[in-house]
């Protein structure tokens, strides 16, 4: 993926404002609520029976933070996203058997969360840069499937 200086600035500038624990928890909770079939990968998380149960679930919150912390590695390694996610791709493909489409869905959810939290800063140019990033991350995570 080729990044312009402006795209890198838009991504890193917004990322510096992100509360990883809060936005990560919200993104994963939204994924599980909006796309309930994704819950099957989180059976060990206990009660996921309602939106309230999901948003209040400490395991969802913790894993959401973990997911977004990992996403931060992409922000730090924009020029080497494939290598950054090689091990996670292997884990999600070989061991967890996650449908790679779910990576795209989570990326789209993250865009919504960022837009909701940073409406003023989340300009169309910023969104375009972030869409490119979540697409690159989803592709890198799905790489082991190809």
UniProtKB/Swiss-Prot annotation:
GO terms for cellular component: blood microparticle; haptoglobin-hemoglobin complex; hemoglobin complex. Keywords: Heme, Iron, Metal-binding, Oxygen transport, Transport. Red blood cells. Signal peptide: none annotated. In pos. 135 of beta chain, other birds usually have Arg (the positively charged AA contributes to the formation of the phosphate-binding site). Here the non-polar Gly reduced phosphate interactions, and oxygen affinity increased. The gene is HBB. GO terms for molecular function: haptoglobin binding; heme binding; metal ion binding; organic acid binding; oxygen binding; oxygen carrier activity; peroxidase activity. Residues 2-146 form the Globin domain. It comes from the Eukaryota. GO terms for biological process: hydrogen peroxide catabolic process. InterPro entries: Globin (IPR000971), Globin-like_sf (IPR009050), Globin/Proto (IPR012292), Hemoglobin_b (IPR002337), Hemoglobin_oxygen_transport (IPR050056). This is Hemoglobin subunit beta.
């Amino acid at each position: 993926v080729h990044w312009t200086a402006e795209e890198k600035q838009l991504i890193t500038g917004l990322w510096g404002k992100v509360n990883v624990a809060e936005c990560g928890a919200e993104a994963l909770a939204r994924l599980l609520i909006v796309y309930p079939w994704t819950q099957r990968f989180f059976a060990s998380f206990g009660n996921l029976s309602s939106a309230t149960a999901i948003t209040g679930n400490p395991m969802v919150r913790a894993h959401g933070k973990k997911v977004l912390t990992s996403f931060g590695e992409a922000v730090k390694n924009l020029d080497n996203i494939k290598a950054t996610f090689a091990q996670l791709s292997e884990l999600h493909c070989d061991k967890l058997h996650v449908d790679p489409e779910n990576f795209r869905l989570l990326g789209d959810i993250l865009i919504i969360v960022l837009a909701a939290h940073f409406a003023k800063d989340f300009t169309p140019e910023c969104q375009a840069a972030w869409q490119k990033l979540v697409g690159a991350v989803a592709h890198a995570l799905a790489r082991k499937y190809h």
